[in-house]
Amino acid sequence: MNPEKDFAPLTPNIVRALNDKLYEKRKVAALEIEKLVRDFVAQNNTVQIKHVIQTLSQEFALSQHPHSRKGGLIGLAACSIALGKDSGLYLKELIEPVLTCFNDADSRLRYYACEALYNIVKVARGAVLPHFNVLFDGLSKLAADPDPNVKSGSELLDRLLKDIVTESSKFDLVGFIPLLRERIYSNNQYARQFIISWILVLVSVPDINLLDYLPEILDGLFQILGDNGKEIRKMCEVVLGEFLKEIKKNPSSVKFAEMANILVIHCQTTDDLIQLTAMCWMREFIQLAGRVMLPYSSGILTAVLPCLAYDDRKKSIKEVANVCNQSLMKLVTPEDDEPDEPKSVAQKQTEPNPEDSLPKQEGTASGGASGPCDSSFGSGISVFTSASTDRAPVTLHLDGIVQVLNCHLSDTTIGMMTRIAVLKWLYHLYIKTPRKMFRHTDSLFPILLQTLSDESDEVVLKDLEVLAEIASSPAGQTDDPGAPDGPDLQVNHSELQVPTSGRANLLNPPNTKGLECSPSTPTMNSYFYKFMINLLQTFSSERKLLEARGPFIIRQLCLLLNAENIFHSMADILLREEDLKFASTMVHTLNTILLTSTELFQLRNQLKDLKTLESQNLFCCLYRSWCHNPVTTVSLCFLTQNYRHAYDLIQKFGDLEVTVDFLTEVDKLVQLIECPIFTYLRLQLLDVKNNPYLMKALYGLLMLLPQSSAFQLLSHRLQCVPNPELLQTEDCLKAAPKSQKGDSPSIDYTELLQHFEKVQKQHLEVRHQRSGRGDHLDRRVVL
């Protein structure tokens, strides 16, 4: 520093002392400056006051010499003390050089800067609030200072500033929020602690409504919640808890829509604390905001559904996620199925962008788990649609929801509980919004069929419920069963389309007397037949599924849908099946279900007597397909008490190729005759006179069997049949003889028998072609 330079009104002694390396001498100089400035204040000499401050600032505080800078800092503090209440007029000039020293490399100098600013702020009190942002900015840097003394000094200044803000009603929150939003993304734990402490203070001040600006800082708060420091995480939990308490207290003023996507992101993070907290917030948002959250359903489901499959290690997250899922599902109502009103161009332009609710920070999406479904939605969170205003009607966007559900159902790595939840959602949507959901049915259908192969019975049951709802919903009824379900869907018609003309031929085979095979129950729609076709195609391509789950699936469908329609339609389809071996296997499966399942009790009773035209039509329809398997055809005749026709069929067995499989099925039929299902048949053996063809049919089966356990069983049963002469009483002899049950006049049994012969001939030809025997149709017994 140039000693010859004029520093007036500062005296040479003051200048010399300010430059001294000893603190005590600089302190003496500060007292002299304080006295000098007081005199200027008394004289109202603002020019000299400004000159003193400028000199201390430019020549000392911003000097290249460290001791001069220290002197300048203590001098500026002395000026502030001398100015007292008038210091507010000069705060900019007093504060700026001190804040510059906050960046000094010398830790002692940074400490003196803290001390000087503390004295300046202490005198000015509320007058410093217009300069709050620069003070906060400087303090946020010192909070992370490596020197403990500097940090201690900054904490004293920080507490003073908090007291001033707390007692003042003039704090500029609007001007402060941008700085807070920027600083909240700091990764330094001390800076984070500083930020959190300030938010806690601001939340506690009644006159400051920080809740209005929560969307600006919520993302940053959740990132701080993942800090490694236990104390910081605890502080952040307290802050978030206070905010949530305020939200519950006054939900009408909360900007739920602007924070929804932020929660969606943090509900997917790998940090358990962040995920649990975000999920708890999401639960409260859904319950408090209600349908305002519906436009964000796809994002919420993306976050919530995977959590439902968590194990006990994350039980808390799983439980909260389940509540979120259930609450969100309840928000969907039938009114969401109403047609969407077309939007004008002006409305589309004024709609907010969902990305606007996210802070524009690089770290926004950090920590989010990249799920297997992310690729379906592009980048970021842009797929979710934001609610425009609270007054505007809330629209449920099914496209995004269905895409998320389809994605999770397609993912084979996803947990069982998640898959069940997805299926529950689909079922719920088909119940509440069937018209809109049927636009997506063609895209959902393949994955729903594929889900039938799931390892979990519970998943398969829910899947069948969805498929049954699709097949029975009135919304699925279309004039053209092959028409696409939506204008913009890519549909694989080879799987679902059933041409109208082809279907008519399929349902009404030529030369069929009194036969109508088209399911006509009003609860069935055009998708019912598509479902049956695709289900049989699935069984055909996945024989293991048919073997392991076929009976289970069909029995459940008989409970969920009309059993008669299921058997009717499957018989129709199998009638045209080109794979004869599969047709035979499928008929055997259906027959076993028909004869043994409790779910088919009513259908068995309907077929038992063939009293109605409908039951006769059903019998004819089943019979034509049952012809793919000779033994099942006989069992169907036993069930329907067509004993004469059963006997005629057994007579035809002499012309068939008797194989081990054939004899095994005869064996099983004999075992079945001993079951409760055929109790009525066994009782009819007491009336041999009126049931001669029953006896002949059973003896025919006996003659087909080799000397096996089944042979012994049936033989013993027939030996128990009493002599009809011994059973006749005097009343019976006097009474007119009863005629046996006659064949129904509406059924052409001759034509049915011809059909049986035709089908069996086709089977024989196919078997011989496979074995390389060509047209050599000699009968061969394989034992």
From Swiss-Prot:
Main subcellular localisation: membrane
HEAT repeat residue intervals: 5-42, 89-126, 171-208, 212-249, 439-476, 561-599
Modified residues (Phosphothreonine): T11, T500
Sorted UniProt keywords: Acetylation, Endoplasmic reticulum, Endosome, Membrane, Microsome, Phosphoprotein, Repeat
InterPro entries: ARM-like, ARM-type_fold, Vac14, VAC14_Fig4p-bd
PTM annotation (N-acetylmethionine): residues: M1
Subcellular localization(s) per the UniProt record: Endosome membrane; Microsome membrane
GO molecular function: identical protein binding
Example GO biological process: regulation of postsynaptic neurotransmitter receptor internalization
Pfam families attached to this UniProt entry: Vac14_Fab1_bd, Vac14_Fig4_bd
GO CC field: cytosol; endoplasmic reticulum; endosome membrane; PAS complex; presynaptic endosome
Tissue: Expressed in brain, lung, kidney and testis with highest levels in brain and testis.
Chain segments carrying region Disordered: 331-372
Quaternary structure and partners: Forms pentamers. Component of the PI(3,5)P2 regulatory complex/PAS complex, at least composed of PIKFYVE, FIG4 and VAC14. VAC14 nucleates the assembly of the complex and serves as a scaffold by pentamerizing into a star-shaped structure, which can bind a single copy each of PIKFYVE and FIG4 and coordinates their activities. Interacts with NOS1.
Role noted for this protein: Scaffold protein component of the PI(3,5)P2 regulatory complex which regulates both the synthesis and turnover of phosphatidylinositol 3,5-bisphosphate (PtdIns(3,5)P2). Pentamerizes into a star-shaped structure and nucleates the assembly of the complex. The pentamer binds a single copy each of PIKFYVE and FIG4 and coordinates both PIKfyve kinase activity and FIG4 phosphatase activity, being required to maintain normal levels of phosphatidylinositol 3-phosphate (PtdIns(3)P) and phosphatidylinositol 5-phosphate (PtdIns(5)P).
Domain notes: The C-terminal domain (residues 523-782) mediates pentameric interactions and is necessary for the formation and maintenance of the PI(3,5)P2 regulatory complex.
Protein name in the entry: Protein VAC14 homolog
The species this protein was found in: Rattus norvegicus (Rat)
Taxonomic lineage: Eukaryota, Metazoa, Chordata, Craniata, Vertebrata
